Amino acid sequence: MEWSLTQNKLLAFHRLMRTDKPIGALLLLWPTLWALWVATPGVPQLWILAVFVAGVWLMRAAGCVVNDYADRKFDGHVKRTANRPLPSGAVTEKEARALFVVLVLISFLLVLTLNTMTILLSIAALALAWVYPFMKRYTHLPQVVLGAAFGWSIPMAFAAVSESVPLSCWLMFLANILWAVAYDTQYAMVDRDDDVKIGIKSTAILFGQYDKLIIGIFQIGVLALMAIIGELNGLGWGYYWSILVAGALFVYQQKLIANREREACFKAFMNNNYVGLVLFLGLAMSYWHF
């Protein structure tokens, strides 16, 4: 019986950290890899790469824990989230706080192996991860904060490699914010009706009938900024082909969200994993001269 209870608790932690749903970690991973490949260029040190990949998974898990902790009073009223570990009672509030601290401490220990500039930037990363879940109560722009949180690994990656944050770094950071607002608005479109009822704010609610148009504008902005980064860094044909493929994926997403159906909007959100992957492959091909 003791083992059964322990096993159930571990499974609840597993669900709380979303390790059963890797999409969030992947959307955080791709911009991190973009930054490491541009900063190095193309040949990141193995230890730095390992630290950032591990950090992505750990901090994404920590972000999910604090997000569910912040939303624990609301999730029970939303059909999609009612069975999450905190509202269902599978994990207590005290356990969630302890798990968050453990994940953050492990992440910080990894960062301590890097240079001072990266360590200082990591403090801002923690602040963004903590603040984001609470923003949806006070502003319709929590997706902007999410974009900053998901993109903060970009200046950290540049700092870890060269102890500098050049123009390409900040253009990539801005591109990631636009991309995050676009894909998280698609995600928020799934819960829009429930969010209106319980008073949760989002860009999906703010944009209203113009949601598809604004998502499209942001997607074009992502492609334009990534093209500028390619020009600044002298990237090759493989990279620009990847931008074209990413553009085709964005067109496909627009087709999916055309009627604002929940399942289709969620499918569009999930499709962004391929956008990140394609752009990374383009960078790899450019630097490796395939």
Curated annotation (Swiss-Prot):
An annotated GO BP: ubiquinone biosynthetic process
Top-rank taxon: Bacteria
Pfam families according to UniProt: UbiA (PF01040)
Biological pathway: Cofactor biosynthesis; ubiquinone biosynthesis
Bilayer topology: Multi-pass membrane protein
Record's GO cellular component terms: plasma membrane
Keywords: Cell inner membrane, Cell membrane, Magnesium, Membrane, Transferase, Transmembrane, Transmembrane helix, Ubiquinone biosynthesis
Entries under Gene3D superfamilies matching the protein: UbiA prenyltransferase
UniProt cofactor(s): Mg(2+)
Catalytic activity: all-trans-octaprenyl diphosphate + 4-hydroxybenzoate = 4-hydroxy-3-(all-trans-octaprenyl)benzoate + diphosphate
Subcellular location: Cell inner membrane
Major place of residence: membrane
Spans through the membrane: 23-43, 46-66, 99-119, 141-161, 163-183, 213-233, 234-254, 268-288
GO molecular function terms noted in the UniProt entry: 4-hydroxybenzoate polyprenyltransferase activity
EC number: 2.5.1.39
Family statement drawn from the similarity comment of this UniProt entry: Belongs to the UbiA prenyltransferase family.
Reported function: Catalyzes the prenylation of para-hydroxybenzoate (PHB) with an all-trans polyprenyl group. Mediates the second step in the final reaction sequence of ubiquinone-8 (UQ-8) biosynthesis, which is the condensation of the polyisoprenoid side chain with PHB, generating the first membrane-bound Q intermediate 3-octaprenyl-4-hydroxybenzoate.
Protein known as: 4-hydroxybenzoate octaprenyltransferase
Taxonomic path: Bacteria, Pseudomonadati, Pseudomonadota, Gammaproteobacteria, Enterobacterales
Gene (UniProt): ubiA
